[in-house]
Regions:
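Short, charged recognition helix plus adjacent turn
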Residues: 86-90
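Short basic helix-loop element that most often maps to the first helix and adjoining turn
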Residues: 2, 30-47, 74
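Recognition helix of helix-turn-helix/homeodomain-like DNA-binding domains
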Residues: 50-66
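DNA major-groove recognition helix of helix-turn-helix/homeodomain DNA-binding modules
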Residues: 70-85
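N-terminal flexible/basic segments that precede or flank functional cores
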Residues: 1-30
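Flexible coil/turn residues that form the inter-helical turn or adjacent wing/linker of helix-turn-helix
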Residues: 28, 39, 65-68
Length: 90
């Protein structure tokens, strides 16, 4: 997806911004899954380490609902990773 102009405040741009947010979250989830599998960890291992129910880890990985920032951070920390969010001037 191309860059979204966040200054334009129309119904259409809100949809584009939401889609961009979903894409970013999905990309992070994909990376977390890759790391989990490289470490040979199960969803249950992640659940035990984070306190998030295994069923919710599965939903997060299946992208059933948009993951909260807190869940992504806890998931990353369970594998000794840090989730970094960076603001970049356009």
């Amino acid at each position: 997806m191309s860059n979204v102009d966040y200054i334009v405040s129309t119904e259409e741009s809100d949809i584009l911004i939401e889609n961009d947010s979903k894409r970013i979250t999905d990309d992070i989830v994909d990376q977390l899954i890759v790391y989990r599998k490289q470490l040979k960890l199960t969803q249950q291992d992640i659940a035990d380490a984070t306190g998030i129910k295994r069923a919710n880890i599965a939903r997060l990985e299946l992208k059933k609902n948009e993951a909260s920032l807190d869940s992504l951070v806890r998931y990353a920390k369970s594998m000794k990773l840090e989730l970094a969010i960076e603001l970049v001037k356009r």
